[in-house]
Amino acid sequence: MLWQKPTAPEQAPAPPRPYQGVRVKEPVKELLRRKRGHASSGASVTPTAVVLPHQPLATYTTVGPSCLDMEVSASTVTEEGALCAGWLSQPAPAALQPLAPWTPYTEYVSHEAVSCPYSADMYVQPVCPSYTVVGPSSVLTYASQPLITNVTTRSAAAPTVGPPLEGPEHQAPLTYFPWPQPLSTLPTSTLQYQPPAPALPGPQFVQLPISIPEPVLPDAEDPRRAIGSLTIDKLLLEEEDSDTYALNHTLSVEGF
C-alpha cells in the first residue's frame, strides 16, 4: 500500500508591514557617546594647535654652548647679574663717522637770481568801470582820454554810436585822438531842395449829373395762377405720365 503524506495547505502571503525605518546594529546615541569620549580623551593627550595671524619670528642659532646646559661654578659667577662665561663677547661697535656737510648742487639756481618777465613793475590802467588793463609800462598806452568813450549816459545831441566790436585777443593797443572841432560847429548842409509846384487854379474835374435807370425785374409768375390756367385734361395726362414712369421703374427692377 502506498502511504501518501498529507500535503500542508498552501500558506497565504503575509500582509505587508508598514515601514519602520532602517535597523542599525548599534544605536546612534551610543555612537555619539563614544565619539565624545574619544574627543575628550584626545584633547587631554594632544593639545590643540592655535594658529595666530602674526608673522613668524626669525629663528636664531645659538653660538657656543648654552648657558643652561653648563654647570656654572660659584667662582664663575662673581656678582648677581654678571655675564655667563660661555657667552661670546660682542665686538666693539665701530666708531661713528660724522657725515660730511651737504655739498651744494652746482646746477641749482636760486629763483631770485632768475629774471622773470612777470616780476617787473606792473601798472593798472582803468579803461572803463568794468574793464581794467594790467601790465608793464610797455603795454599800457598813456593818453589824455580813455580809449572807450561809450560808457557815459547818452544825450540827445550826442551821435548814436554802435557797441564796440570785439577784436582778436592779440590786438595792437589803440590810441585816442581827440576831435579838434565839436559837432555843433560843423557846417550845415548846403543842399537846397526846390519848393513843390503850386496847385493848378480852378477845379480840374467837372461834375456832370448822370441818371442811371433802375433795372426792371420781370414779374414772377405765380404758380397758383399757372395751375389755375391749366385744364383738367392736362393735369390728368401729367399724372398718368408720372404713374407710368413709376410702374416701368418697378418692372425693370423686378425683372432684373
Curated annotation (Swiss-Prot):
It is found in: Nucleus. One of its GO terms (molecular function) is POU domain binding. Ubiquitinated; mediated by SIAH1 or SIAH2 and leading to its subsequent proteasomal degradation. InterPro entries: OCA (IPR047571), PD-C2-AF1 (IPR015389). The keyword Ribosomal protein does not apply. Residues 16-38 form the OCA domain. The keyword Nucleus applies. It comes from the Eukaryota. GO terms for cellular component: RNA polymerase II transcription regulator complex. One of its GO terms (biological process) is cellular response to virus. Keywords: Activator, Nucleus, Transcription, Transcription regulation, Ubl conjugation. Pfam families: PD-C2-AF1 (PF09310). Belongs to the POU2AF family. In the N-terminus possesses a conserved domain OCA for bivalent binding to class II POU domain-containing transcription factors and to an octamer DNA motif. Transcriptional coactivator that specifically associates with either POU2F1/OCT1 or POU2F2/OCT2. It boosts the POU2F1/OCT1 mediated promoter activity and to a lesser extent, that of POU2F2/OCT2. It recognizes the POU domains of POU2F1/OCT1 and POU2F2/OCT2. It is essential for the response of B-cells to antigens and required for the formation of germinal centers. Regulates IL6 expression in B cells as POU2F2/OCT2 coactivator. Interacts with POU2F1/OCT1 and POU2F2/OCT2; the interaction increases POU2F1 and POU2F2 transactivation activity. This is POU domain class 2-associating factor 1. The gene is POU2AF1.
